[in-house]
């Protein structure tokens, strides 16, 4: 099915009691790993770039072109959305212009009325080009590209107002955070999520900070209305651990590898790529989106 807007497959997840994964990429290798995992599991997927990752990769146009061409060259058949994660207003508009098929405008750091007004503007522009829109109310804990949130519970009335702007799916704070969860984390506020989904019945909710949340809590959140779960830190840890292990083994057994040119980055990065693919496949299974393409 190739490159598509995320609206239909996220809504299908909401209606059928599973969630799709929004997996952040940081380079060519991660993008390949995510695509391989999605194809192997026959799962729809959003490949996401944060503002920082896009800058690192050479800009939004480079990211859009990379993902689009890999989908074609790798023969990917599952639905893939190219999604901006936590974008400022100008970044959201740029991504719409260069060919992203889904964007998140994050105005959660703005006064509520300004957030709503700017979101409505983004929705009008995006929908005119068939681009799906995610927005946020409350703030997600942790730090994302310099935006620091304390992990608020999204106000119900603000969530209802945000849905009325015409967005396609809503990120709302329910005690979740970006990055590793501390030992004293109290868990998702599932009672608040239940109130939230009752206020916007049938509307897809997005769970940010999906890495490190116990599987039973994720599954209960999906049962209550979460239809998209974002994952980044988990993939980063998997990649880092596998790459470090490869380096340790190489240094300890250098003679064994003599002549194999393992200094070649294509070989050096391979274990990390495989680890990311494995992590993504495992999350797809937990989210219930395998064989939903």
Curated annotation (Swiss-Prot):
Cofactor(s) required for function per UniProt: Zn(2+)
Pfam families: F_bP_aldolase
One example of a Gene Ontology biological process annotation: glycolytic process
EC number: 4.1.2.13
Membrane-spanning residues: none
Top-rank taxon: Bacteria
Catalyzed chemical reaction(s): beta-D-fructose 1,6-bisphosphate = D-glyceraldehyde 3-phosphate + dihydroxyacetone phosphate
Enzyme class, spelled out: lyase
Binding site for dihydroxyacetone phosphate: 179, 209-211, 230-233
Coiled coil region boundaries: none
Binding residue positions for Zn(2+) 1: 86, 178, 208
GO molecular function, one term: zinc ion binding
Catalytic machinery residues: 85 (proton donor)
The entry's keywords: Glycolysis, Lyase, Metal-binding, Zinc
Keyword check for Ribosomal protein: no
Function according to Swiss-Prot or TrEMBL: Catalyzes the aldol condensation of dihydroxyacetone phosphate (DHAP or glycerone-phosphate) with glyceraldehyde 3-phosphate (G3P) to form fructose 1,6-bisphosphate (FBP) in gluconeogenesis and the reverse reaction in glycolysis.
Similarity comment: family membership: Belongs to the class II fructose-bisphosphate aldolase family.
Protein name: Fructose-bisphosphate aldolase
Gene name linked to the record: fba
């Amino acid at each position: 099915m190739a490159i598509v807007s995320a609206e239909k497959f996220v809504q299908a997840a909401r209606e059928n009691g599973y969630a799709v994964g929004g997996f952040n990429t940081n380079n060519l290798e991660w993008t390949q790993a995510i695509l391989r995992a999605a194809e192997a599991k026959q799962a729809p997927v959003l490949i996401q770039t944060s503002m920082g990752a896009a800058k690192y990769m050479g800009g939004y146009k480079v990211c859009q072109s990379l993902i689009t061409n890999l989908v074609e060259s790798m023969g990917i058949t599952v639905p893939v959305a190219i999604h901006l994660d936590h974008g400022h207003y100008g970044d959201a508009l740029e991504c719409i212009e260069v060919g992203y098929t889904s964007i998140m405008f994050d105005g959660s750091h703005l006064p509520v009325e300004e957030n709503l007004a700017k979101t409505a503007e983004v929705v009008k522009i995006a929908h005119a080009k068939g681009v799906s829109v995610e927005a946020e109310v409350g703030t997600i804990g942790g730090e994302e590209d310099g935006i620091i949130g304390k992990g608020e519970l999204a106000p119900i009335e603000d969530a209802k107002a945000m849905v009325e702007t015409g967005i396609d799916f809503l990120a709302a704070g329910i005690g979740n955070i970006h990055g590793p969860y501390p030992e004293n984390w109290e868990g998702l506020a599932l009672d608040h999520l239940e109130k939230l989904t009752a206020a916007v019945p049938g509307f897809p909710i997005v769970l940010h900070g999906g890495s490190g949340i116990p599987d039973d809590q994720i599954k209960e959140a999906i049962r209550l209305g979460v239809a998209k779960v974002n994952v980044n830190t988990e993939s980063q840890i998997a990649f880092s651990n596998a790459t470090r292990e490869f380096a340790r083994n190489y240094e300890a057994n250098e003679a064994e590898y003599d002549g194999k040119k393992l200094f070649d980055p294509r070989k050096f990065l391979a274990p990390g790529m495989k680890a990311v693919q494995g992590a993504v496949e495992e999350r797809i299974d937990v989210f219930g989106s395998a064989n939903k393409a």
